[in-house]
Amino acid sequence: MNRPHSCLSFCWMYFAASGIRAVETANGKYAQKLFSDLFEDYSSALRPVEDTDAVLNVTLQVTLSQIKDMDERNQILTAYLWIRQTWHDAYLTWDRDQYDRLDSIRIPSDLVWRPDIVLYNKADDESSEPVNTNVVLRYDGLITWDSPAITKSSCVVDVTYFPFDSQQCNLTFGSWTYNGNQVDIFNALDSGDLSDFIEDVEWEVHGMPAVKNVISYGCCSEPYPDVTFTLLLKRRSSFYIVNLLIPCVLISFLAPLSFYLPAASGEKVSLGVTILLAMTVFQLMVAEIMPASENVPLIGKYYIATMALITASTALTIMVMNIHFCGAEARPVPHWAKVVILKYMSRILFVYDVGESCLSPRHSQEPEQVTKVYSKLPESNLKTSRNKDLSRKKEVRKLLKNDLGYQGGIPQNTDSYCARYEALTKNIEYIAKCLKDHKATNSKGSEWKKVAKVIDRFFMWIFFAMVFVMTVLIIARAD
């Protein structure tokens, strides 16, 4: 039972395959006959219209497949497109009933007339026309030509908001020799087709609207239509944020820290110059990417502003170091500086001497040696001049009486004791004067150092605020 059934199935399959092969053979014969009949007296050099005054309509559709390159420096967009053109050829029609219901054939595109649609704003010397692929010829004369093309078009790049910029690149297609009275061009859709677009790693495509334009040139009175596709691009900024912006922000916050570095370390100016050189390297990296235009990119403005801050901080650091190393030969700190800087600003900025804090009041304690010397000397000896010998002798007599323990009168050799005590008094006054001068000298130097430290701390917070505000403004403008 199964064997006859299998034989019957095999016979049916054989006859079906034979029938299909016979149909294909018949269609092939009719296609060859149709091709011979159509192109026997056909010329692809002339516009395929029966009336020479008639307008031939060409419909254009562009599909964006891939963005191959966006050269901002040379302002060239390289794109991979699929271009579809459709038009009617009045001389390539046939009756389907005469050719076994054959409704379409595919033939080489160079055998038929083709509209000379070119990319107006191409940016390369080589031809960017579509590839010579086959065309689909329908029985009613409708010709459809699908062909891929790699185009290089000029694109005006606005880098003002780089790396947060958006670009608009135009692709303008039109006939090169025919005017609008001979060949008219239309866009098949309101925008380019993005359904088969391959995502780009650097650019986001937000649309590709199409619009028809009719332009009249000064040389000719006839209109010249074209179809312009505007490619809306937005840059993916993550790469530039990580590699250019974040390092710049971190380096810019290092600039105020040069004021926090102790002046005695000798590295304040070196740090500022090193930061300035690092910013210069980043600036050169951005300059290599950007076109040489008058529009300065946003990140370039940030670099320039940061470099200006670093230059100013380095100059101020030199000034502060000059104040810090004021020695004994320098003038005393002015009164207004003592009040404004040492009294108020130092408290506001929490700048104190060693061992001093905001909770413990500052007491000026004299050295123990100086206190002992002044305790031994009467006030009259510290305030009177040396020409008052009479007063000095009286005081010396009192000292002799107290020190020698006499209860009665003064001994006869008082003059010798007076001479000794007078010499001793002069020595003590000299020592006290030296200690006082030494203290005044040290006090003068320490006051200038504290002034420099307060100014350092003041500029540090000022520059921190400026860098922070500048960074926020740049990010706000980018958004």
UniProtKB/Swiss-Prot annotation:
Regulation: Activated by a myriad of ligands such as acetylcholine. AChR activity is inhibited by the antagonist alpha-conotoxins RgIA and GeXXA, small disulfide-constrained peptides from cone snails.
Gene that this polypeptide is encoded by: Chrna9
UniProt xrefs under InterPro entries: Neur_chan_lig-bd (IPR006202), Neur_chan_lig-bd_sf (IPR036734), Neur_channel (IPR006201), Neuro-gated_channel_TM_sf (IPR036719), Neuro_actylchol_rec (IPR038050), Neurotrans-gated_channel_TM (IPR006029), Neurotransmitter_ion_chnl_CS (IPR018000), Nicotinic_acetylcholine_rcpt (IPR002394)
The keyword Cytoplasm is assigned to this record: no
Protein name as catalogued: Neuronal acetylcholine receptor subunit alpha-9
Topology Cytoplasmic: residue spans: 324-457
Quaternary data: Forms homo- or heterooligomeric channels in conjunction with CHRNA10. The native outer hair cell receptor may be composed of CHRNA9:CHRNA10 heterooligomers. Found in the stoichiometric form (CHRNA9)2:(CHRNA10)3.
Transmembrane segments: 238-262, 269-287, 302-323, 458-476
Record note on what altering W176T does: The CHRNA9:CHRNA10 receptor is 8.5-fold less potently inhibited by the alpha-conotoxin RgIA
Keywords from the named record: Calcium, Calcium channel, Calcium transport, Cell membrane, Disulfide bond, Glycoprotein, Ion channel, Ion transport, Ligand-gated ion channel, Membrane, Metal-binding, Receptor, Signal, Sodium, Synapse, Transmembrane, Transmembrane helix, Transport
Reaction equations catalysed: Ca(2+)(in) = Ca(2+)(out); Mg(2+)(in) = Mg(2+)(out); K(+)(in) = K(+)(out); Na(+)(in) = Na(+)(out)
Main localization of the protein described in the UniProt heading: membrane
Site (Key residue important for potent inhibition of the CHRNA9:CHRNA10 receptor by the alpha-conotoxin RgIA (AC P0C1D0)): residue numbering on this chain: T86, D146
Lipid bilayer topology: Multi-pass membrane protein
